A protein has these predicted regions:
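ER/Golgi luminal nucleotide-sugar-dependent glycosyltransferases, focusing on the catalytic module
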Residues: 1-216
């Protein structure tokens, strides 16, 4: 018996067959019509009408309300079509659809049993081209010129404020419970890298606790 359930999210019904071939659980999001083999965030208790704002988290809400008790594996994972967890580092030019099934994580081996969560490679905002930021957000540099000369000053909060509106992050952080609020605020103010795409693998019990924190 497999010790992990992995959900693969897609916006395109044409991806269903490949996801099934990989033995992942297909999830169809967005407005297109999927087969009844696909899980969807539109049935039962849901917030699918907020998908434009919350992305994959409308599906996470759906799982929390309608499906969580049906997951009987120790581990649970979430990936996206064309973004998967692989067993080991592999060159991109060595990957194709024919060998995908052999290189993807399908089980959690005993070496990882002591971990609570598995994440993908981090993305560093330090790698973002400064010329692009200056071109579109020159005023922000005038208000805070130190960020022009120090990558560390261009932390996650700096980038969030630039691309998603200044002050919105602080409003969101203020909604967190007291046990997480300051830790997350410090993380955004100090770090310059994060794990993207809302992809993660964790123990199912931890997922339950996670949902209790992020959803009201």
């Amino acid at each position: 018996m497999k010790n992990i359930s992995i959900f693969c999210l897609t916006l395109n019904p044409e991806h269903e067959k490949l996801i099934e071939k990989l033995s992942y659980i297909p999830v169809g999001l967005g407005e297109k019509i999927f087969s009844n083999k696909c899980l969807s965030d539109k049935s039962e208790l849901n917030i699918s009408n907020k998908n434009l704002n919350y992305g994959e988290y409308t599906f996470h809400y759906w799982i929390w309300k309608n499906y969580l008790n049906k997951i009987n594996t120790t581990w649970v994972g979430f990936c996206q079509y064309r973004k998967f967890f692989v067993k080991s580092k592999i060159l991109e030019d060595k990957i194709d659809f024919d060998n995908l099934d052999n290189i993807l994580i399908k089980e959690i081996n005993y070496k990882n049993e002591n971990f609570d969560c598995i994440l993908g490679n981090k993305f560093s905002v330090e790698d973002y081209k400064i010329s692009k930021i200056i071109k579109h957000h020159f005023l922000d540099f005038l208000l805070n010129p130190k960020t022009l000369f120090s990558k560390k000053k261009r932390n996650l909060k700096f980038h969030f404020d630039i691309f998603h509106g200044k002050g919105n992050l602080d409003l969101a952080i203020d909604l967190l419970d007291e046990s997480n609020k300051e830790d997350f605020r410090n993380f955004m103010n100090k770090e310059t890298a994060f794990n993207p795409h809302n992809m993660f693998i964790c123990k199912t019990e931890i997922l339950k606790n996670y949902y209790e924190v992020i959803f009201p």
